[in-house]
């Protein structure tokens, strides 16, 4: 999309709110992966009456990013893409026909990353996203201020956002009295492509449940 890319999780969350307004959507379920999970979590806290369900896929807090990866994303984006594609997956050799005949997992990931980089010729969105993740410090407050049910979808072999790095958010959500569910899938950081059915079914089952009435803040 056009326009300036958000430079922080908070700015991106406000963009979500503006998008709901522009689309005339009064209430929505938010599903976010990685950086998107932080954005969805923050948006659910900022607009608690408008978010019915929150799904955090491949999340962690704090979501610290390796300084080497941040530097590479700015100075050598192609190198950073290779690093992410290696560490984001539990295997680069998908089981036969698991993702369709002839699927090239690494190549597809690289192609997608290059497309994202080309999507904004003014801003290096790759680097901007890493910095936003690394600097976000509002996780505990977001879990306290949000009210909707939360589902965590975590990859047991995730090296980018290890499951243990989400435990603080899980505990914060429970301490705030929110309904919390955790689904663990035996894959890496790309849950949507490495375990598409398990991820889809977890989302489906969670979203089909009617949200409990929101508690007053």
Task: Annotate each predicted stretch with a short phrase.
Residues 5, 38-86:
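Flexible "cap/lid" loop of the alpha/beta hydrolase fold
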Residues 146, 152-154, 158:
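Short beta-strand/loop motif that positions the catalytic acidic residue
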Residues 159-165:
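Conserved alpha/beta-hydrolase "acid-adjacent" motif
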Residues 167-179:
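Active-site-adjacent alpha-helix of alpha/beta-hydrolase-fold enzymes
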Residues 176-217:
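Catalytic active-site module of serine/aspartate enzymes centered on a nucleophile-bearing elbow/loop
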